[in-house]
Amino acid sequence: MQQFEWIHGAWLGLAIMLEIAANVLLKFSDGFRRKCYGILSLAAVLAAFSALSQAVKGIDLSVAYALWGGFGIAATLAAGWVLFGQRLNPKGWVGVILLLAGMVMIKFA
């Protein structure tokens, strides 16, 4: 396991925020009918992967990717709830809980 440095955690945090932004912008693009939002979404995805590539210099890939994906999904869920009024059914909440539990288990494995 690599030694954790805060700069790599910051890169991972930036990657997560950019992924969330990309997902929200993709929703705003309305299937790329609103091209400006679609292009911004693509740029945010590229920037997210660039930040993730910096994060994995100091964080194990399995841990970084699990945290990036898991927090990205959970935060996108929250953004969808706040911005678009989207709701999960009980099975969806079970999935989110399992996702978060899996992230914790990977981190401590």
Curated annotation (Swiss-Prot):
Subcellular localization(s) per the UniProt record: Cell inner membrane
Pfam families: Multi_Drug_Res
InterPro entries hit by this protein: Small_drug/metabolite_transptr (IPR000390), Small_multidrug_res (IPR045324), Spermidine_export_MdtI (IPR023737)
Keywords assigned: Cell inner membrane, Cell membrane, Membrane, Transmembrane, Transmembrane helix, Transport
Membrane topology annotation: Multi-pass membrane protein
Transmembrane segments: 6-26, 36-56, 64-84, 88-108
Leader sequence residues: none
GO terms under cellular component: plasma membrane
GO MF entry, a single one: spermidine transmembrane transporter activity
GO annotation (BP), single: spermidine transmembrane transport
Protein's UniProt keywords contain Ribosomal protein: no
Highest taxon, organism lineage: Bacteria
Complex and partners: Forms a complex with MdtJ.
Role played: Catalyzes the excretion of spermidine.
Family to which this protein belongs: Belongs to the drug/metabolite transporter (DMT) superfamily. Small multidrug resistance (SMR) (TC 2.A.7.1) family. MdtI subfamily.
Name the record gives this protein: Spermidine export protein MdtI
Natural source organism: Salmonella typhimurium (strain LT2 / SGSC1412 / ATCC 700720)
